[in-house]
Amino acid sequence: MMNTSNGMISGPSSSSSPAANPQSPGIKTYFKTPEGKYKLHYEKTHSSVKSIHFSNSNPMCHAFDPDAKDGHDLLIGLNSGDVYTVSLRQQLQDVSKKLVGALHYNKDGSVNNSRCTSISWVPGGDGAFVVAHADGNLYVYEKNKDGATDSTFPAIRDPTQFSVDKAKYSKSNPVARWHICQGAINSIAFSNDGAHLATVGRDGYLRIFDFLTQKLVCGGKSYYGALLCCSWSMDGKYILTGGEDDLVQVWSMEDRKVVAWGEGHNSWVSGVAFDSYWSSPNSDGSGEHVMYRFGSVGQDTQLLLWDLEMDEIVVPLRRPPGGSPTYSTGSQSAHWDNVIPVGTLQPAPCKRDVPKLSPIIAHRVHTEPLSGLMFTQESVVTACREGHIKIWTRPSDSETQSNSCPEANPTSALLSTSSPKDNKTSLSSKVISGSSFKQ
């Protein structure tokens, strides 16, 4: 599911032509990658299947758990701070425009009346979920506990410091409050195993926590302004962030620092995601990832796709007296002079000390600023601020195999022979750019 603002979703396309959509000047019905064409599958708007109205507040965020045991698989966070869990199937079966069979938490903002900014189920958490708020606090709930019970927390001792407090009573829900920062928490994301929680906020910091021990592991600051979004790789080794500096940053959990940054957007980056369904054309035989594919969307209306190659992440280690600097590749542990201690929040590193990424494609996919990005096995899904969703189908297997053959694709062969050592601070990727503009 993706956020929409006006109940409209994209519908079936009436044309398979690569010509531009006449209703969206400058936007084509496909974009190309080294694997082949991603074709626009849905481009018209249709009425929503179900519309739910909230009388006193607006929904701000939601999360879906397909593995929920009791049927309550959908979380909804409101502008008032209220939180609901409901059964998606039950909502679709009911003809009314009201929630049915909902469990209600933080009713009327009784625990926290600032708006919900991000919400997530805890992977493997047996119904546990977390809710982030605009005042910099995050609350941990247990779905099976009564949401109407009183939860009282002590006063925050130092608003500038991270702190965790448990509820005063064992039957309370929420069960814990995490004070993350003084400004709003803009987005949260769990690693796939649920071991780590990443948050990004208005203060421009990424923070990564060990969720079980409730300790800060690492984090750092953007180059400018707030961070707006974050996402984990499936193996939990890397975290993406994007924000008001128009950049995408790649963080390494092993090194606890930024290992690459990407430049290509012309405005704020509003969504980032790894493509866990994409298969790297190369393999080192160890079962380890040698290349990651990820995407980003921004308020410049563009979708950018990126390739992160482990052998091309080259970072300076140290400069011997009177000699040239030594380097370490991303296939090993890319340590600099000093190992970053656990629990350290770092300033933004000097850009020339971190490898720079360029997108493999940049494509204008909507006429309005983009708000969301999601990868599925069959497609790439994009959503814009006006509530329109587009689904781009992946290249067919035969097309992918044809383009991966050097004899059939001279351009691919040329790119595959380029050496990553030609430029030690920049990753070799070609930009295939569509039209773009800054909002």
Label every PLM stretch briefly.
Residues S96, Y105-N137, Y141-K145, S170-S172, ...:
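Fungal eukaryote-biased detector of long internal structured cores
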Residues H46, V86-A102, D135-V175, Q182, ...:
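Per-blade loop-tip surfaces of WD-repeat and WD-like beta-propellers in eukaryotic adaptors/scaffolds
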Residues S57-P66, S110-W121, H179-A189, G225-W232, ...:
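Canonical WD40 repeat/beta-propeller blade segments in eukaryotic WD-repeat proteins
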